């Protein structure tokens, strides 16, 4: 058999495209060099064994897509066609994803800890998480965060507007539990339940009553009672949930009602508001929230989905194009238990308790995953993922991602800037494709994807390396 045909048969079309790309890119900054050591960004102070031991595990950050602003973290301006590692973490085996997980219902509370005299070696779990904005990215680890990418507007929070091309520790905020990155700004939640924002303030998404930039993280003085437990943001608006389930929103509203605050313009209504206001029209407590381009979604603790805002592309999934500021449940999901939601620019995803993914809204870039570019009026299960149990979903502006219980990553939608991580795809990829990872000759074994974050034209994922 001809060598080319044999390679295609053995590795598949996408893997062959990847092999061919690597073979022709030896002099490209995006080409893979297995002799280049991935920098160790962080090591647990309690880790005493090697990465292949029982007490430690290697977790890597990989990125792909457009990187002209440094958002890929590799140190240079580059575009990557496939996932490539740019940082490693040596974590205790007890590490977990940082809570709250974006758009996800909170897990059941853990059992109470043993008294110290019964469990003298007990330690607080190390938490790790990632987020992508328009042209910047972040890693959250053990209460600290590293951030990189475009610096315009002060979105990196270093006190200036310079870009960063490698993950850089931000010393201006600690005890961080969750970070959400927007278009030109950033939002963080700390362990005291306080919200901090920084970056471009022209849309009011910072929540500081003024529309100017903030170069450092600044506390949001909200009118809520108690702590905040969940945050979300988009290009121009932000949302926060209190521990009692009240939802507050702020930022830009161009008459579409995405803030959920009323039909007019005023301190308690729907104009672009630069201070947090309670969404009084939401009749039930909520536990998770996701901000789309011009709409908002929220989940109750029982897994019922509510949404509001723009609906010209069926973003709300109600079967018509009638949008508005008033929160309403999605009729076809009345008896479906949703555990996670994710919002794109004009489309929506929902993950059921059974591990199935539903999508609806704008489909022009293939981001709905239904093998077409048609808009979808109501939530429909993505059949290409029907045989998988999905545990995590994410949206970019016009692309989508899902992680299975086996640690496989699928992506679909807009591939114009290689943000799907699979070389050789058309610019519109209308059904999920598995993202393959190169087997580096580093002795760390296979990749298991833990989390993925998708920006407008790039993506970052966390993978555990399962040594042989």
Residue spans of the language-model regions?
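Conserved core positions of repeat-based scaffolds
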Residues: 63, 136-139, 147, 185-188, ...
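Short glycine/serine- and acidic-residue-enriched loop/turn motifs that recur at repeat junctions
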Residues: 35, 50-57, 61-82, 94-97, ...
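Conserved beta-strand position repeated across blades of beta-propeller domains
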Residues: 131, 139, 168, 180, ...
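N-terminal mitochondrial targeting presequence
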Residues: 1-46, 51-55
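WD40 beta-propeller repeat fold
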Residues: 40-44, 48-172, 178-180, 185-188, ...
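Tandem repeat domain/solenoid detector
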Residues: 144, 191-194, 203, 215, ...
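Blade-level signature of beta-propeller repeat domains, shared across WD40, Kelch, NHL, RCC1
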Residues: 408-409, 414, 423-425, 430-468
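Conserved loop/turn at the beginning of each blade in beta-propeller domains
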Residues: 76, 123, 131, 160-163, ...
């Amino acid at each position: 058999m001809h060598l080319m045909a044999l390679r295609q048969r053995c590795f598949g079309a996408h893997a062959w495209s990847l092999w061919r790309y690597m073979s022709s890119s030896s002099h490209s900054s995006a080409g893979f060099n297995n002799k280049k050591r991935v920098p160790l960004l962080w090591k647990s102070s309690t880790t005493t064994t090697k990465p292949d031991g029982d007490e430690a595990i290697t977790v890597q950050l990989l990125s792909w897509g457009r990187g002209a602003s440094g958002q890929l973290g590799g140190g240079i301006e580059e575009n990557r066609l496939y996932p490539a590692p740019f940082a490693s973490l040596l974590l205790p085996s007890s590490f977990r994803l940082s809570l709250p997980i974006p758009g996800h219902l909170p897990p059941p509370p853990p059992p109470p800890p043993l008294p110290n005299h019964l469990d003298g070696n007990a330690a607080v779990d190390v938490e790790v998480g990632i987020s992508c904005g328009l042209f910047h990215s972040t890693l959250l680890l053990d209460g600290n965060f590293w951030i990189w990418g475009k610096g315009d507007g002060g979105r990196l929070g270093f006190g200036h507007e310079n870009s960063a091309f490698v993950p850089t520790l931000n010393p201006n905020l600690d005890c961080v539990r969750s970070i959400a990155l927007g278009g030109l700004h950033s939002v963080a939640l700390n362990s005291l339940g306080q919200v901090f924002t920084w970056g471009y303030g022209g849309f009011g998404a910072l929540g500081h009553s003024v529309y100017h930039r903030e170069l450092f993280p600044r506390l949001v003085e909200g009118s809520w009672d108690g702590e905040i437990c969940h945050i979300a943001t988009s290009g121009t608006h932000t949302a926060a949930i209190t521990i009692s389930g009240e939802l507050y929103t702020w930022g830009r509203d161009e008459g579409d009602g995405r803030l959920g605050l009323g039909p007019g313009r005023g301190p308690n209504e729907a104009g672009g508001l630069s201070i947090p206001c309670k969404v009084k029209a939401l009749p039930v407590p909520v536990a998770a929230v996701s901000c789309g381009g011009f709409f908002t979604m929220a989940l109750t603790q029982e897994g019922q989905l509510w949404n509001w805002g723009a609906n010209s592309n069926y973003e709300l999934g109600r079967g018509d194009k009638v949008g508005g500021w008033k929160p309403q449940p999605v009729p076809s999901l009345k008896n479906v238990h949703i555990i996670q939601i994710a919002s794109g620019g004009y489309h929506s995803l929902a993950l059921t308790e059974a591990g199935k993914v539903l999508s609806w809204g704008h489909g022009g870039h293939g981001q709905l995953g239904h093998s077409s570019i048609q808009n979808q009026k109501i939530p429909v299960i993505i059949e290409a993922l029907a045989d998988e149990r999905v545990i995590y979903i994410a949206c970019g502006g016009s692309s989508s991602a899902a992680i299975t219980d086996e640690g496989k990553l699928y992506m679909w939608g807009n591939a114009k800037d290689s943000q799907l991580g699979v070389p050789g795809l058309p610019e519109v990829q209308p059904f999920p494709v598995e993202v393959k990872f190169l087997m580096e000759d580093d002795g760390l074994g296979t990749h298991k994807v833990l989390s993925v974050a998708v920006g407008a034209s790039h993506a970052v994922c966390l993978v555990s390396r399962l040594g042989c």
